[in-house]
C-alpha cells in the first residue's frame, strides 16, 4: 500500500485527521510535524527527510502551503495530491497584520485567547455553537502551544506565492474547499 502523508493546519494536530486515519487503516499514514520550524521551506524539508521515497500527500490550510512547497522541492516523490481549504496566494497585508497581533498575544503570555479568536474563522457558521468541536480545536491549540504557534505564523507570513508553480503540478490533484 502506498503511504499517505497528512499535513494539518495551523494549531492542529493529528486529532484533526482522526476520522481519515481510521478510514485509511489499511494504508501507512504519517502525520507530518509542522511545529518545529519557522519557514515553510524548512518544514517541507523536514517532512521530506522523514518521508518514504514515494507517497500521496494531503494538506489542510497551512498544510496545503507546506504540501505545495514539498512539490517544489521533490515533485518526483509525490504520487498524488489533495489541497484542502488552502490557497496558493501569499498573505495580503491585512492578513499579515492580524497574524502579528496574534503573535503578540502569544508572546505576551495571552496565548489562551488565540484559539478563541481564531475559532470563528476555522469553522462553518453553522458550527460556531458546537461546543464539542470548539473543545477539540482548543485542545489541539493547547497541545501545539504558543512557541510552535509563533513559528507556524512566522512560516505562513513568509510563504512563497505558489500561483506561478501551480501549472507545474503533474500528479492527480484534488482541490477541495468548503
Feature roles, as predicted:
Residues 1-46, 60:
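Conserved HGGG/HGGXW glycine-rich cap/lid loop of the alpha/beta-hydrolase fold
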Residues 13, 38-40, 86-94, 125-126:
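A short beta-to-alpha transition loop/helix N-cap that caps and shapes the active-site region
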Residues 19, 69-73:
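Active-site signature of alpha/beta-hydrolase-fold catalytic machinery across serine-
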Residues 59-63, 67:
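Gly/Ala-rich beta-loop-alpha elbow adjacent to hydrolase catalytic centers
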Residues 72-116, 121:
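Flexible "cap/lid" loop of the alpha/beta hydrolase fold
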Residues 91-94, 109-170:
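Conserved alpha/beta-hydrolase catalytic His-Asp/Glu region
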Residues 168-169, 175-178:
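Short beta-strand/loop motif that positions the catalytic acidic residue
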Amino acid at each position: 500500500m502506498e503511504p499517505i502523508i497528512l499535513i494539518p493546519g495551523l494549531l492542529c494536530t493529528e486529532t484533526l485527521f482522526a476520522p481519515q486515519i481510521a478510514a485509511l487503516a489499511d494504508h501507512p499514514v504519517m502525520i507530518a510535524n509542522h511545529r518545529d520550524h519557522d519557514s515553510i521551506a524548512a518544514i517541507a524539508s523536514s517532512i521530506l527527510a522523514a518521508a518514504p521515497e514515494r507517497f500521496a500527500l494531503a494538506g489542510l490550510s497551512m498544510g496545503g502551503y507546506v504540501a505545495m512547497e514539498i512539490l517544489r522541492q521533490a515533485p518526483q516523490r509525490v504520487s498524488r495530491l489533495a489541497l484542502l481549504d488552502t490557497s496558493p496566494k501569499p498573505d495580503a497585508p491585512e492578513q499579515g497584520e492580524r497574524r502579528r497581533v496574534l503573535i503578540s498575544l502569544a508572546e505576551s503570555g495571552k496565548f489562551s485567547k488565540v484559539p478563541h479568536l481564531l475559532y470563528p474563522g476555522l469553522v462553518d457558521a453553522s458550527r460556531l455553537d458546537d461546543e464539542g468541536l470548539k473543545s477539540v480545536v482548543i485542545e489541539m491549540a493547547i497541545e501545539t502551544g504558543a512557541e510552535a504557534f509563533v513559528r507556524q505564523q512566522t512560516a505562513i507570513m513568509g510563504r512563497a506565492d505558489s500561483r506561478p508553480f501551480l501549472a507545474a503540478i503533474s500528479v492527480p490533484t484534488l482541490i477541495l474547499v468548503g
